[in-house]
From Swiss-Prot:
The gene is ezrA. It holds the Pfam family EzrA. It comes from Streptococcus pyogenes serotype M5 (strain Manfredo). Residues 102-141, 274-350, 459-520 form a coiled coil. It is a single-pass membrane protein. This is Septation ring formation regulator EzrA. It comes from the Bacteria. Its main location: membrane.
Length: 574
């Protein structure tokens, strides 16, 4: 056999071996893919879809939810019956083809199975998601229904337990409860007939009406309690108190109290009747008005009770106070009459006392008898309180005025006595001032001093004349006494000033001799000052002239002389 043939045979054998090895490798790879697909199929089939379907089925869906559930359930049935069986067949076919080394067709079957598994996987995910949505939606709807029913049942129980607290509103509340019950029935009917949208709207209305009625029923008992308990009790209390006050001789400015009682009772009945409409804002507003009218009656009674206490106290005090003020006025009149015999008094006091007497007389005529017969009066105590307080205020003003008048007249005699004493003192002082001036041996008396001296003398004579009258004008005496006091004080000051100026001028004129011979200014001032001193008797001008000249040549000399004089000055010995 030739070598060429041998090589050909060897090559063929090698190719067969290689082809076999490649076939074995491909078959193993396909076996692995087929096994993987089988595992995916089993994993999908093992998903708890049946359990989830049974769980949703147990919710007893109705309407559109039930229809949707049936569609998804049927899709799952189709998958389990058809799709999984078809996948199983294709896997079996792929295994056979792979075992017979028909790799191309086997690969096609593997790809087909993989595509089917992908579709099934997506369908199962959609089914499970839809089932979960149905479950959540049903649970949500169930919770809404349960919540609404719980609200209704709680409201029903609350109304039943507190039925006595709703008064005339109970029929309307029952009617509203039946309407809500009807709405729940409509919800069930619509939900069962497959109309979830309208059923949801009806459920919303039923829940809203339940909440609204619950809020109303929470507020009604307080309003009813006012109408059926509080107001009647207060009215009974007022009527009982009113009768008792009438028995105790109370009278009232308001003459329609009985009618007001009746009007309030009618308002209570009317508001109770209107309450059946459940217009709570209007009922509360009317209750407020009723309470205000009741409170106003309480205020009337309390005002009269408080007024009685004050009026009773004042009725006892007024006669005593009036008698006291009247006695004061009589004493004041007598005192003024006594003083009038000796003094000319201001008409103000007499007129004031007459005004007091008029006020006292008016109270005696109009109020005294009322106070003394207080227990028999047929007037409201509030009016009597005002009357008594007005009279007491008048008496207080009268008493205060009496004290002012008394203060004005009580010191008249003292004023006269003091004026006479002052006059004697001032006359003596005038003589002492005159002697004091004479002892100074002045060249003459300044004209301003003479004017002040004679003016003071005239004022003392005027005071003396006034005190010498048969009836003394005490106001004039007081005025003249004050004028004399000021005049004598001014005259004393002027006396000291004149004497000081004259004495210091003499001393400075003598002192100027030191400078006259060589200071022409001092010589000129000396001559001028000497003329003012001896001829014109103007001691102030003379002092100013010579002191100014000396200050120019010897500063401080004037102060030295003034200080020395003040230490040794002689005082007037009164």
């Amino acid at each position: 056999m030739s070598s060429g043939i041998i090589l050909l045979i060897v090559a063929i054998v090698l190719l067969v071996i290689i082809a076999y090895l490649v076939g074995v490798i491909i078959r193993k790879r396909n076996d692995s893919l087929i096994t993987s697909l089988e595992e995916r199929k089993q994993a999908l089939f093992a998903l708890p879809v049946n359990d989830e379907i049974e769980e949703v089925k147990s919710l007893h869906l109705i309407g559109q939810s039930q229809t949707s559930f049936r569609e998804w359930n049927q899709k799952w049935v189709d998958l389990t019956v058809n799709s999984f069986a078809d996948i199983e067949n294709h896997i079996f076919e792929a295994e056979n083809l792979n075992d017979t080394f028909n790799f191309i067709r086997a690969k096609h079957e593997i790809n087909s199975v993989e595509s089917q598994l992908n579709l099934v996987e997506e369908d199962i995910a959609s089914i499970r998601e839809a089932l979960n949505i149905l479950k959540e939606q049903e649970e949500k709807n169930s919770a809404r229904v349960t919540h609404a029913l719980d609200l209704y049942e709680k409201l029903q129980a609350s109304i039943s337990e507190n039925e006595d607290n709703f008064g005339s509103t109970m029929p309307e509340i029952d009617k509203q409860m039946k309407n809500i019950e009807t709405e729940f029935s409509q919800f069930v009917a619509l939900n069962s007939s497959g109309d979830p949208v309208e059923a949801s709207e009806v459920l919303d209305r039923a829940e809203e009406h339940t909440i609204a009625l619950g809020q109303i029923t929470e507020q009604i008992p307080a309003i009813v309690a006012k109408l059926e308990d509080d107001f009647p009790d207060q009215l009974d209390d007022l009527e009982t108190g009113y009768r008792r006050l009438l028995e105790e001789n109370y009278h009232f400015p308001e003459k329609n109290i009985e009618a007001r009682f009746q009007e309030i009772r009618e308002s209570i009945r009317a508001n109770s009747s209107e309450l059946v409409t459940l217009d709570l804002d209007r009922a509360r507003e009317e209750n407020t008005h009723i309470q205000e009218r009741i409170d106003s009656l309480y205020e009337v009674f309390e005002r009269e009770i408080a007024a009685y206490k004050v009026a009773a106290k004042n009725s006892k005090m007024l006669p005593r106070y009036l008698a006291h003020v009247k006695r004061n006025n009589e004493q004041l009149k007598n005192e003024i009459a006594r003083l009038s015999r000796k003094y000319i008094l201001s008409e103000t006091e007499s007129l004031t006392v007459k005004a007091f007497e008029k006020d006292i007389k008016e109270i005696e005529d109009s109020t005294l008898a009322v106070a003394e017969q207080f227990g028999l009066q047929e007037k409201p105590f509030s009016e009597l309180q005002v009357t008594f307080e007005r009279s007491i205020k008048t008496l207080t003003n009268v008493e205060s005025g009496q004290m002012d008048v008394f203060a004005a007249v009580k010191d008249i005699e003292k004023i006269e006595s003091q004026a006479r004493h002052n006059l004697d003192v001032y006359v003596t002082q005038l003589h002492m001032i005159k002697r004091y001036m004479e002892k100074r041996h002045l060249p003459g008396i300044p004209q301003d001093f003479l004017s002040a001296f004679f003016t003071t003398s005239s004022q003392l004579e005027a005071l003396m004349d006034e005190l010498s009258r048969g009836r003394i004008n005490i106001e004039a005496v007081s005025r003249l006494s004050e004028v004399a006091t000021v005049a004598i004080a001014n005259l004393e000051d002027l006396t000291y000033q004149v004497v000081q100026n004259a004495t210091l001028t003499e001393q400075l004129l003598q002192y100027s001799n030191r400078y006259r011979s060589f200071e022409a200014g001092v010589q000129s001032s000396f001559e001028h000052a000497l003329r003012l001193f001896e001829v014109e008797n103007d001691y102030q001008a003379s002092f100013d002239e010579i002191s100014y000249a000396l200050e120019t040549v010897e500063p401080g000399v004037t102060d030295r002389f003034v200080n020395s004089y003040e230490k040794t000055r002689e005082h007037i010995r009164f």
